């Protein structure tokens, strides 16, 4: 039976690969997409998500979400993804529109209609998820688990300690990590290992039309290079859903620093139990890289 999922995203070039896998992996049933400001503005992430859905002729409802973090000024990752968020490929025009309600309400309504609890997947800042949990706490029993791409037990990628998705809205992340829902965190400890090799990247234009599109996007992606390999950060959250055997997880207490002058946005991962607090997150600490690369190749071969 296919696993029902809702995907919250901020496309973003590596988001595009994650969205492809979420749509076409035969084990998954992507029922709703929502967008959030992150890699670029929410208007751009929404436009990019709609372009991808149209490209793949995927009839999946999409709702636009939060334009700004809960309490602080927005930051973006245009330096990594380009000013549009998905530079490098000319998508055809379409007339698709997002739903007429905010993302967190769209998630609430879809959860309440679902016949069974649903897995939420968040591969951008956690603003929409925090709004859902704080404004609609009655939804918690309908969430099977939350799988995120975000955080790190070690170094950061936008500050020495903080990963971008958490640092973009630390207050939202803190709310989510305190919520009591089941959380799986695929952070930089694994996503920095999730590299597509130059040899594989060179095969994409001959794979299919999606391969050609992704190859064009990848030429503008700055998380690695076409010559050294590219990190597929967001794809790790989708990979865990389908191939959890590729990941080494450890239950840990995780908190988010919101006040530090140099550490705001840091996920404090208590690997050794020093704080004596109960674990609230399953933290991915290692990845079977060859297995991941093989799975990616298998999934992208299924995409038209």
UniProtKB/Swiss-Prot annotation:
It comes from the Bacteria. It holds the Pfam family IU_nuc_hydro. It is an enzyme of class 3 (hydrolase). The active site is at 233. Its EC number is 3.2.-.-. GO terms for biological process: purine nucleobase metabolic process; purine nucleoside catabolic process; pyrimidine nucleobase metabolic process. PROSITE patterns: IUNH. GO terms for cellular component: cytosol. One of its GO terms (molecular function) is uridine nucleosidase activity. InterPro entries: I/U_nuclsd_hydro_CS, Inosine/uridine_hydrolase_dom, IUNH, Nucleosid_hydro_RihC_nonspecif, Ribo_hydro-like. Keywords: Glycosidase, Hydrolase. Hydrolyzes both purine and pyrimidine ribonucleosides with a broad-substrate specificity. Belongs to the IUNH family. RihC subfamily. This is Non-specific ribonucleoside hydrolase RihC. The lineage of its organism: Bacteria, Pseudomonadati, Pseudomonadota, Gammaproteobacteria, Enterobacterales.
């Amino acid at each position: 039976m296919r696993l029902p999922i809702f995907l919250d995203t901020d496309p973003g070039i590596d988001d595009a690969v994650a969205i492809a896998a979420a749509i076409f992996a035969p084990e998954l049933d992507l029922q709703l997409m929502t967008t959030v400001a992150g890699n670029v503005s929410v208007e751009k992430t929404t436009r990019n998500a709609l372009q991808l859905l149209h490209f793949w002729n995927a009839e999946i409802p999409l709702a636009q979400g939060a334009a700004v973090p809960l309490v602080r000024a927005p930051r973006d990752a245009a330096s990594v993804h380009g000013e549009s968020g998905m530079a490098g490929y000319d998508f055809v025009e379409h007339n698709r529109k997002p739903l007429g309600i905010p993302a967190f309400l769209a998630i609430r309504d879809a959860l309440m209609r679902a016949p069974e609890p649903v897995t939420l997947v968040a591969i951008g800042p956690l603003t929409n998820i925090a709004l859902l949990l704080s404004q609609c706490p009655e939804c918690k029993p309908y969430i099977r688990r939350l799988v995120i791409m975000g955080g790190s037990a070690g170094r950061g990628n936008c500050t020495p300690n903080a990963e971008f998705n958490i640092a973009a809205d630390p207050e939202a992340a803190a709310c989510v990590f305190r919520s009591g829902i089941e959380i799986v965190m695929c952070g930089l400890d694994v996503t920095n290992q999730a590299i597509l090799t130059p040899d594989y990247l060179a095969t994409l234009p001959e794979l299919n039309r999606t391969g050609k599109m992704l190859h064009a996007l990848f030429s503008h992606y700055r998380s690695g290079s076409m010559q050294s390999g590219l990190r597929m950060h967001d794809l790790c959250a989708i990979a865990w859903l389908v191939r959890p055997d590729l990941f080494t997880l450890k239950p840990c207490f995780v908190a988010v620093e919101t006040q530090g002058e140099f550490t705001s946005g840091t996920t404090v991962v208590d690997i050794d139990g020093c704080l004596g607090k109960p674990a609230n997150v399953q933290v991915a600490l290692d990845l079977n890289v060859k297995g991941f690369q093989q799975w990616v190749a298998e999934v992208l071969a299924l995409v038209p």
